[in-house]
Amino acid sequence: MEQFRGTTIVCVRRNGRVALGGDGQVTLGNTVMKGNARKVRRLYGDKVLAGFAGGTADAFTLFERFEGKLEKYSGNLTRAAVELAKDWRTERALRRLEALLAVADKETSLLITGNGDVIEPEDNLIAMGSGGPFAQAAARALLDNTELSAREIAERALNIAADICIYTNRHLTIEEM
């Protein structure tokens, strides 16, 4: 069976604000199955933003687990991310999940992978998914050469990725804090 694939997620920090956005396209093989999926959510009483790239069902499982870790560790984003990554790497049922998570609160942005990686970006920018490299290049240029807000940069970067990546559309969800 073919995999659901493709998306673009971008997380941008600027001037004390963070914006996390994603497109809405879900693709199975070469067919668009849905154009308005919400791949970005608010968690933990709206104090944490989270977005996913990869399998939709896998991502929802990971969102649930991550929110549980946030509850357990009183909203400590880094600790919750590390504990989720440990479980993801070691628990047999979770090891097969294929997704990436980008998470952010007011102070920190992190990329969480199934290999047990928890990565904090050095340049206030996370971009992932099939359109990630395009969004990252666009966002980096906008961060370096404009005074646009984090939200404006995320939106423009996602739209540029949608122009280039066939697995990314312009139905955007952007959350900001």
Curated annotation (Swiss-Prot):
Recorded hits in Gene3D superfamilies, A to Z, give: Glutamine Phosphoribosylpyrophosphate, subunit 1, domain 1
Control of this protein's activity = Allosterically activated by HslU binding.
GO cellular component terms given for this protein: HslUV protease complex; proteasome core complex
| Enzyme Commission number(s) from the entry | 3.4.25.2
* GO MF term list: metal ion binding; threonine-type endopeptidase activity
Cite the InterPro entries for this sequence.
ATP-dep_Prtase_HsIV_su, Ntn_hydrolases_N, Proteasome_sua/b, Proteasome_suB-type
Annotated positions binding Na(+): A162, C165, T168
Give the GO terms filed under biological process for this record: proteolysis involved in protein catabolic process
Compartment(s) where it occurs, according to its Swiss-Prot or TrEMBL record: Cytoplasm
Q: Active site annotated at which positions? A: T7
Family statement drawn from the similarity comment of this UniProt entry: Belongs to the peptidase T1B family. HslV subfamily.
| HAMAP family, sorted | HslV
Q: What is this protein for, i.e. what is its function? A: Protease subunit of a proteasome-like degradation complex believed to be a general protein degrading machinery.
Protein name (record): ATP-dependent protease subunit HslV
Organism of origin is Thioalkalivibrio sulfidiphilus (strain HL-EbGR7)
Source gene?
hslV
